[in-house]
Design a protein with these regions (language model features):
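Short, structured segments at the rim of ligand-binding sites
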Residues: 1-424
Length: 424
């Protein structure tokens, strides 16, 4: 499982029934850890004095937890982009000098927007390699706060990183977002969690967030399960030929603040019915087929970019033409996801095209398929979203499948429990 050159060959089940164990939400887990650590610091207590419950066990969350708990002089976050952004802001307001670094790919993921904003607030941050990219040396101290303006169309994680430290700033924070604001549900999730822990934080207008100086409250935080991870089971339900297929997904709830809960709406157009239930006091979702798929899907993913690979893969397998917009952040994710999708679907004979630099378009064009395994580019969502395509391409092979540990460590075991056969 740890061999970089491992390849899994997948054979789908004839019937799709059962209960699927989902990981806890990575987005909520990482925010809960940072807020909990800041709450403890405000009371001169050690970080992680009170641990959130049902914490995600994915790589991103584990490296964040270890960094907050141990605070080593050199923090290596591996490929965890969320950890890089959130911890950079956290370290800027935390006494001590730390170096934060990661994989070679991480050293090519831009962070200048966040660093520049933190410097405006008084942070002492030095680039140790190429200007604008990790690794960083962060010398933490009390920051004054004030007014900062950053682009709203780059990454909502820059916004969330700044917002979460804002209650610790002497003068609070007025954060102005320029241009189109992408992934707004993730910003709303951050603000909601901050308020749950006692912060005075909210939108002052359509493009400005105001956070007043006020210590966080220490709180036992229970984390719900992950809608992003549920999307791959929606994909499986959409693609299976089992008309009586039924999956139970515990730990998902109606009214979730997670942006990727939009998956239930999108997949209602791709043949999947979502039923909310409560069994023995636990909220959950039951998936069934509704046998209603649109003839074409046009959609703007500006608020849920992490669903793009799942929906592109599903539409390609079902032969549904599409035009998808709002994908500008996909080029700075774990890989260039737009190019990765284009190259890997071509191996399956699907010729998607890129328009306007970031739009993905497919009108049914085909190309000559190859027998090469699907490459994952060290990107968990490539492996996660392509695996259910074995319903359409039995025997589909995926290279470097262990990348799923970044967000869904037990994915392959859950696939096997659901009846998929996995051959190495």
């Amino acid at each position: 499982m740890n061999d970089l050159y491992t390849t899994y060959r997948l054979l789908p089940p004839a019937t799709l029934r059962g209960t699927v164990n989902l990981p806890a939400s990575k987005s909520i887990s990482n925010r809960a850890l940072i807020i909990s650590a800041l709450a403890a610091a405000a009371r001169q207590q050690q970080a992680m004095t009170i641990m959130p419950s049902n914490l995600s066990d994915c790589d991103d969350t584990v490296v964040t937890l270890n960094a907050l708990r141990d605070m080593p002089p050199i923090i290596d976050i591996g490929a965890a982009g969320t950890a890089m952004r959130f911890l950079t802001a956290y370290l800027a307001v935390t006494e001590g000098e730390h170096i934060i670094t990661g994989t070679e790919r991480m050293k090519h993921r831009p962070i200048a927007i966040l660093v520049n904003a933190l410097r405006q607030l008084g942070a002492d941050i030095e680039y140790l390699g190429e200007e604008g990219f990790p690794p960083l040396c962060v010398r933490g101290r009390k920051l004054n706060g004030g007014t900062v303006e950053i682009p709203g169309n780059m990454s909502s994680q820059y916004v969330s990183a700044l917002l979460m430290i804002a209650p610790t700033l002497t003068n609070g924070l007025e954060l102005r977002l320029k241009g189109n604001i992408i992934s707004r549900p993730y910003i709303d999730l951050t603000l909601w969690m901050m308020r749950e822990c006692g912060a005075d934080a909210d939108w002052a207008s359509g493009d400005t967030v105001l956070v007043r100086q006020q210590p966080y409250e220490l709180k036992n935080y229970a984390i719900e399960n992950d809608w992003s991870s549920a999307s791959y089971w929606y994909e499986a339900m959409s693609l299976t030929s089992d008309e009586d297929a039924e999956l139970l997904l515990p730990g998902l709830r109606d009214g979730s603040r997670q942006g990727d809960a939009a998956v239930r709406y999108i997949f209602s157009m791709l043949g999947v019915k979502t039923i909310y239930e409560t069994i023995d006091g636990q909220q959950m979702v039951r998936l069934r087929k509704n046998n209603r798929s649109v003839p074409r899907l046009d959609y703007d993913f500006v608020n849920s970019p992490d669903l793009v690979q799942t929906i592109v893969a599903t539409c390609a397998a079902k032969g549904i033409p599409f035009h998808f917009r709002g994908l500008q952040t996909l080029k700075i994710k774990e890989t260039d996801r737009i190019e990765a999708l284009r190259q890997e679907l071509a191996k399956l004979g699907i010729a998607i095209s890129v328009e306007n630099g970031t739009d993905l378009v497919w009108n049914g064009e085909r190309c000559e398929p190859s027998t090469d395994p699907i490459d994952t580019y060290e990107d968990h969502r490539m492996a996660l979203s392509f695996a259910p395509l074995s319903f359409a391409w039995p025997g589909l092979a995926i290279r470097n499948p262990q990348v799923v540990s970044k967000s869904y460590p037990r994915y392959w075991q859950e696939m096997q429990r659901a009846g998929f056969k996995i051959e190495e």
